[in-house]
Amino acid sequence: MILLWSCLLVAVVGILGTATPQPGNSSLHRLTRQLLQQYHKEVRPVYNWAEATTVYLDLCVHAVLDVDVQNQKLKTSVWYREVWNDEFLSWNSSLFDEIQEISLPLSALWAPDIIINEFVDVERSPDLPYVYVNSSGTIRNHKPIQVVSACSLQTYAFPFDIQNCSLTFNSILHTVEDIDLGFLRNREDIENDKRAFMNDSEWQLLSVSSTYHIRQSSAGDFAQIRFNVVIRRCPLAYVVSLLIPSIFLMLVDLGSFYLPPNCRARIVFKTNVLVGYTVFRVNMSDEVPRSAGCTPLIGVFFTVCMALLVLSLSKSILLIKFLYEERHSGQERPLMCLQGDSDAEESRLYLGAPRADVTESPVHQEHRVPSDTLKDFWFQFRSINNSLRTRDQIHQKEVEWLAILYRFDQLLFRIYLAVLGLYTVTLCSLWALWSRM
């Protein structure tokens, strides 16, 4: 009886052990062992060494992270895809439970040595250790990359500038006889693909054009694929914070020309406008990109605006100086006329007064007392009349001089307005021209 129960227990254990699947016997494990057991990642995966391995590339721009104008660097986030065929990693799916695709560690496989020529910093990408391999041996390696690349950034048309930065992919060691490059998608699809781009940033993606060419060098001919990333700056924030305040200050300065040229408050007003513009320019200096190659047009715009404000203030000071000198020279004339002896002598001769060298008798001196009072009164009246007449002449000259100053002020205002208009048209034309290039 004991022997019977022992045999039954052994049979049950055997059945259970046979029914439990072993991990090493699964189709996926058997396929992985078969593919990697005798695989050598140091060797390019072709049976015929004379055939080149074609690597198909694709690029999708996700965002523009930073544009460093001073150091001429562009930082972008891209989705990079490369596909190639490994002839040593193909299998018959019917022998492995119809497995069409598996994931394998990239470190265990041969991978093309594709680099970006414009790299100026360490490539930053998440650690994705696996790639997909299908039954025909096609390997798909997809990963996001943060690319910090060198780019010739032109800020002449800031903030309406358009930048064209290239990302050139090629093998660092293998020539075109060993590794060739191709496009994973149609070029038109690559150029117009903007679905993944973040439009809420400072930059707008215009296009991603792509070209294929062979670079010839002393080490051999290398296949290259170049993606030209064309981006345009969104100018609204800079127009609101930089251009519109400057335009308002210039319009306020133009309004000051309607003040009378002899008004001293006009100079105070223009001085306050100039000081305010200087403070505004200093506070907004960090908003304008600095480039050693060229000066942005907006920098020229600020400089010319400040020069025009200084010119406007200088013109008003010059007009006030002319008017003051005319008044100062006119105020001295009545004093000279009152202090002179010619009018007194003429008055005495006109009234029949005797000269100082003629002696009169006592009888005449007695009867001359009322006559002397009348003559003194007439002399004072004549002096006042001459003084008023002189003042009227001076006032008339001041009025005439002020009229001349008004006309001169209008002439300078028209010249100033013409210069400002010509400068505005020229600047807008240059901005429009450079933004299209």
Curated annotation (Swiss-Prot):
Organism: Mus musculus
Residues covered by region (HA-stretch): 377-409
Positions in the Cytoplasmic compartment: 260-264, 314-410
Positions of glycan attachment: 25, 92, 134, 283
Free-text domain note: The HA-stretch region of HTR3B seems to confer increased conductance to HTR3A/HTR3B heteromers compared to that of HTR3A homomers.
InterPro entries: 5HT3_rcpt, 5HT3_rcpt_B, LGIC_TM_5-HT3, Neur_chan_lig-bd, Neur_chan_lig-bd_sf, Neur_channel, Neuro-gated_channel_TM_sf, Neuro_actylchol_rec
Catalytic activity line of the entry: Na(+)(in) = Na(+)(out); K(+)(in) = K(+)(out); Ca(2+)(in) = Ca(2+)(out)
Signal sequence region: 1-21
Disulfide bonds: 151-165
One of the Pfam families matching this protein, by short name: Neur_chan_LBD
Coiled coil regions in record: none
Record-given protein name: 5-hydroxytryptamine receptor 3B
Gene giving rise to this polypeptide: Htr3b
Gene3D superfamilies to which the protein is assigned, alphabetical: Neurotransmitter-gated ion-channel ligand-binding domain (2.70.170.10), Neurotransmitter-gated ion-channel transmembrane domain (1.20.58.390)
